[in-house]
Amino acid sequence: MAVNPLDFLKNMTSFKDNIDNLKKEMSQIVVCGRAGSDVIVVEMNGEFLVKKVSIKEEFFSDLDNEALEHMIKSAFNDAISKVKEEIKSKTMGSMPFGI
């Protein structure tokens, strides 16, 4: 079966357009990772860039440094998991062959 080079180029252009659209959608994703009953909230976008970190002030005196570090790590990991879930839900079916 011969492959028509023009059809191949059309498909590649369409594939590139799909990738560009997905990148745009990913940049618009915003999620919040939370830890310690919302003591710490990390806002992250679909490009895994942290936009904001919030720590409830009233909990500073009650937390030791190790507990605070653990909650910050947990909030970041929660945000990363949520971004991955959003990306997966937005890209399922839009990429050929399950890529």
Swiss-Prot record:
Molecular-function GO terms, alphabetical: DNA binding
Main location: cytoplasm
Keywords attached to this entry: Cytoplasm, DNA-binding
Subunit structure, interactors included: Homodimer.
Record's subcellular location: Cytoplasm, Nucleoid
Name of the molecule in the record: Nucleoid-associated protein EbfC
Gene3D superfamilies attached to this UniProt entry: Nucleoid-associated protein YbaB-like domain
GO cellular component term, pick one: bacterial nucleoid
Domain of life of the native organism: Bacteria
Protein family according to the UniProt entry: Belongs to the YbaB/EbfC family.
Function, in words: Binds to DNA and alters its conformation. May be involved in regulation of gene expression, nucleoid organization and DNA protection.
